[in-house]
Structure formats: structure tokens, C-alpha cells
Regions:
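Residue-level preference for the first positions of well-ordered beta-strands
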Residues: 34-37, 98-100, 128-130
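Conserved P-loop NTPase "ATPase switch" module shared by AAA+ and STAND
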Residues: 94-112
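Hydrophobic positions on the alpha1 helix immediately C-terminal to the Walker A/P-loop
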Residues: 49, 53
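N-terminal pre-Walker A segment at the start of P-loop NTPase domains
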Residues: 2-29
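Short glycine-rich substrate-engagement loop in P-loop NTPases that contacts/grips substrate
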Residues: 64-92
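Post-Walker A helix-loop "phosphate-sensing" segment adjacent to the P-loop in P-loop NTPases
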Residues: 54-62
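Walker A/P-loop nucleotide-binding motif
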Residues: 32-48
Length: 173
């Protein structure tokens, strides 16, 4: 199993967004799915905030695109769809909670035929997961990408903890 991560290089977490994320992590630890999503469009600071969290918790940020794609290379298309949940679980099981995930776009690949939110919820049953989500909350729905995009999704987040990132990193649900 290849370990793919981004080293933490920023200062410790402080400020309103960091407090909200800490509260979301604490809340998630008592839920069935221990999942916190940092939802925001590209450029809203999700990666930087994940690096801050990594530094505070002495952890690393896992680049899911790199970790998963390297494991899927040798598999057929059918095997990729079937094995992806197990491969994702194996990748995150190498790390202590909270497990920090960035660059999760591969989970949305239509060829893999997966439900990305359900995948993340599944791996968050036994560990706290904090993941970036390239989208937003709108009318109670968790959106990924924009309407018309091939990977567009609109999901009911259930009790998943959502921290909305708006570019200034101060908005929260």
C-alpha cells in the first residue's frame, strides 16, 4: 500500500473557522458516522485548513486521488468498481483519527460507479474522517460540482458535520 500525504507546514489552528472545525470533530466523534466535510468551491482554503488540522493533531493529509489511483492501475474496470471501497478503507486505516482527506475527486469518477458520500460515511464508522468536498450546501442538500457537470451530485448529508468554506473561511452550517 502506497502512502500518499501532504506534510503539514502551516501554523497551528486559530480563528473562527478552526474553532468550528474542532467543534465539528468533537460532535462527529459521538455520531454513527464520524464524518466532517469541509465544503467549498476551488480556492476557498480547504487544503490550507486541512494542513492546519494536520499540524495540530500531529497527522498528515492524504491525497486520495494519488493513493487510490496507484492502487487501481492494475485492475480491470469491473474490479476497480468492486474493490474501491476496500482500497479506500485500507488507505485510511494506516492513519490515526482524525484522518484527513484531500483531493477526493477520484471518488466521483462516473466509471467507478460509486456514491462518494456513502463511501466516506462507510469509512467513518470506526474513525473520525475530515475531508475536503468541492461543493456547497444549498437548501439542505450537499452539492458537488455544478449542475450540468458530469460528476454533479446532490445528496442529503444526514448527520454528517458540514463546515462551509466561503473563501474567507468563516461560514458554517
Amino acid at each position: 500500500m502506497t502512502r500518499v500525504f501532504m506534510p503539514a507546514t502551516r501554523t497551528f489552528m486559530n480563528g473562527p473557522i478552526h474553532d468550528k472545525i474542532k467543534r465539528a470533530i468533537q460532535t462527529a466523534e459521538g455520531l454513527y458516522y464520524r464524518l466532517v466535510l469541509l465544503a467549498g468551491t476551488t480556492g476557498t482554503g480547504k487544503t490550507g485548513v486541512l494542513r492546519d488540522i494536520a499540524e495540530e493533531f500531529g497527522s498528515t493529509v492524504i491525497n486520495i486521488n494519488l493513493a487510490i489511483s496507484s492502487e487501481l492501475l492494475e485492475l480491470t474496470a469491473k474490479q476497480r468498481s468492486l474493490r474501491l471501497p476496500d482500497i479506500l478503507d485500507q488507505v485510511v486505516s494506516q492513519f490515526q483519527s482524525p484522518v484527513l482527506l484531500d483531493n477526493i475527486e477520484i471518488l466521483f469518477d462516473k466509471n467507478l460507479q460509486q456514491d462518494p458520500l456513502r463511501l466516506l460515511q462507510g469509512i467513518s464508522r470506526n474513525r473520525t474522517i475530515v475531508a475536503s468536498w468541492n461543493g456547497a450546501m444549498h437548501s439542505g442538500k450537499l452539492l458537488y460540482a455544478e449542475a450540468g457537470h458530469p460528476e454533479y451530485r446532490s445528496d442529503d448529508p444526514g448527520d454528517t458535520q458540514i463546515v462551509e468554506m466561503d473563501g474567507t473561511a468563516t461560514v458554517d452550517r
